[in-house]
């Protein structure tokens, strides 16, 4: 999937700062459309159709980011809702707003609201959209007490709109942290949902993900994938207003990058690259294209935390998963210094049998082992192995 992120409808956007209460590109039904000055192929009402067609011609799929609700601009102009007797003002929930973006009002659970969501997904289907990242919806940061959980009814409306639009679309809900007590409702209505707030290249955030993955490990199943968020690798900022002219590459050390990739992979989180791909170095590219890693990510089942022993957040974490005629294990060192990790193979396999072990990141066979395997692991690093 190639996904176009937030505010593709904002003609004055220049960097990662939002222009509050700015004019947005919108059609006569209050539906946001690509800014023509930034996406010239959208002129004449074409939307993202030409871009989607090109991406499809490469054998890839196309996605867009949306905010829940209806543009405030549409409410101020009181645009009609397509195929409905209602208008934008009838369906807007003026107190349901995003705390970090001024573009939208949420929708009431009322007549006309479903019609509006139907109309925008009808439009997205005509463009050839395959993936929707809907933001300010898995959990909101304003008036969370208004509904059983944030945007509960809007999630259901979006699900119905996708089901009725005539095109299959993956639905991803952001931001987190989604609540585990809402797992059944999320699984019924979405394919992905964020377990955390925005994830960036800081060790504390990465370490916290062990807790999140443990909490959600039993909710991973075909069609439902709790989401660890994007992979902040490679060149992360090009037009940031607050990181200087050179902006920056990931701040994660190489061992920390290995830890992140190993945890996301064995947990079966969706994998979305958050850097600027044309500027990838060989190291970053090797993380994204490791065939054995991608095979593990596709094929594993029943991934779970097998062992964790830490003091003040420093120690050892081990995750295991079933593969096809094999097992996988990820050995994580959360200490600030290199450490040896001993893994008892006999706890997940038949004791006293010999098993071959393949190091996925090193790309080599490590030999045959019976009952135990020991690895020396870098500080904040990981060893990811296939056992067969």
What are these model-derived regions, one by one?
Residues 347-362:
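Solvent-exposed beta-hairpin/edge-strand motifs
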Residues 259-308:
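Catalytic cores of secreted or luminal carbohydrate-active enzymes
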Residues 103-108, 115, 163-276:
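Glycan-recognition surfaces
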Residues 368-388:
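C-terminal beta-strand-rich structural cap/linker in extracellular carbohydrate-active enzymes
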